[in-house]
Amino acid sequence: MAELNGSQILVECLKEQGVDTIFGYPGGAVLNLYDELYRHQDEIKHILTSHEQGAAHAADGYARATGKVGVCLATSGPGATNLVTGIANAYMDSVPMVAITGNVGTNLLGKDSFQEVDIAGVTMPITKHNFIVKDVKKLAKTIRRAFKIAASGRPGPVLVDITKDVTANKCEYKKEDVKKADKAKKEKSFTEKELDKAAEMIAKAKRPVIFLGGGAIISEAHKEIKALVDLMDAPVCDSLMGKGAFDGTDKRYMGMIGMHGTKTANFSVTECDLLVVLGARFSDRVTGNTKSFAKRAKILHIDIDPAEINKNVKVDLSIEGDVKDVLKELNKKLTKQSHDEWMEHIAEMQAKYPLRYHENELTGPYFIEELYRLTKGDAIISTEVGQHQMWAAQFYKYSKPRTLLTSGGLGTMGYGLGASIGAQIGLPNKQVINLAGDGCFRMNMNELATAAHYNVPIIEVVFNNNVLGMVRQWQTLFYGKRYSQTLLSQDIDYVKLAESMNIKAFRVTKKDEVDEVIKKALKAKGPVFIEVVIDKNESVWPMVPAGATLEETFSEEDVKEKETKAKK
């Protein structure tokens, strides 16, 4: 047993937990920690981001891509508050993260000291748990608990706030082996009776649908899900967060459900007699009007978090547990079903309602389809938020889990660039591509400097239409084309901006330029920037208006038909 100071104890605890990378930004309250990290550069890589929000998003992207806990570090006051959006983003999407912040000395707490903020109080609603450490003897135990809480059950962010004196004070430290975080409760939280009821519901169904949420990704249940689909002979849809839990190239895959889901997925949920929901929380962006959601169906909901059961949608049977663990047992009770008539109906809808875009011009969907073709679907895609995010969900096919990193719950513009850096550092042998709109890029474009500084070989694609595209689309459809504050500056040369950081940069203005530029970007050894100039009137289709039912899903063709009838 050795006597170490708090900074040494923190670093030793991080090593215990297998931490190999930290994303952060130094400052006065964490100087002792940074001094100790300096001594361990060969064991723990520190990535200096351009802004603390970028550090939080990078830790998030690292966690989503690798499945490990992401770690970010910031100083007190504004350093800590700059993490808040990233922490909230991780909380909404159930991402395991430990955010470590420094604070003023214990004797200065509560005195409005320089750069003092009650960051524990600020983040209480957006963390699974948070701690303030004012005694060095409690530091090691707290760090270990933080990592366990972040990764256990339904994952999420944990904040550890450490006063500056704790980082200098000494106490005895004893190394401990890492205790693996429990994915579910130690004792099985579901019963044989529940499994029997679920098996009976599945056996009786004539028109079943399987709906996958983010929990299906977190639980690593893709093999069990494939087995369930085979046994049930059922079509599959997913939420934005569930993409990759089931092979997007499988003919039984209908696409995404919800506000910008496919007509096939939305209509099938309305028509089905059984909806099997795996690790989803029934977001309003998925369900539309909850009173009419899956109105003809019995609903079986499997989720690890009991708080999500019957919260937004009332279900007929719920099973509390990790999706993978539950399906392992449930699949044993099922016999192979056949639903030929139902599957033929699904195939007919897929043929009738394909996803479409304007094929005669350069569009976001076209570029993303080409990106999919040239990467053979093997890239990790991160996105910002808006039209390009929906196009990425619709037109890139995800056949593996943890290949789409996107802000689903909070809808954070500026998330994707930092997340792509974190993912690329976590998985250096994968190709990571961030898709952004010009509005989102302007939120955190400073992280391009981070990619340049560390030569992180991400590809940053910016779809430039000089407007806030998704907001403008709503103004077009629902606000009488009154375009209030959605026009962006048209005199910014983003290519020159990237080149000023010694980043290889391209501008694409025509369809016939796309293939060559993507190929060059994929061959590059460092970061690449691609600006794709698209029309401001390009929209995302299909669409369900806010508060409407999934039955009211409409396409561009439906809008034009309605306008034509109105003119007669």
Identify the role of each PLM range:
Residues 7-11, 15, 19-20, 33-38, ...:
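Active-site diphosphate/adenylate-binding microenvironment
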Residues 115, 453-546:
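Thiamine diphosphate
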Residues 415, 419-457, 463:
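Catalytic phosphate/nucleotide-handling subdomain of diverse soluble enzymes
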Residues 299, 371, 383, 422, ...:
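Hydrophobic, well-ordered secondary-structure elements that form the walls
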Residues 1-334, 374-377, 457-460, 477-480, ...:
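N-terminal alpha/beta PP-like core and its mobile active-site loop of ThDP/TPP-dependent enzymes
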Residues 25-27, 46-57, 72-79, 134-135, ...:
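Active-site nucleophile and cofactor-binding loops and adjacent substrate-binding regions
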Residues 137, 200, 296-387, 511, ...:
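Phosphate/pyrophosphate-binding active-site segments
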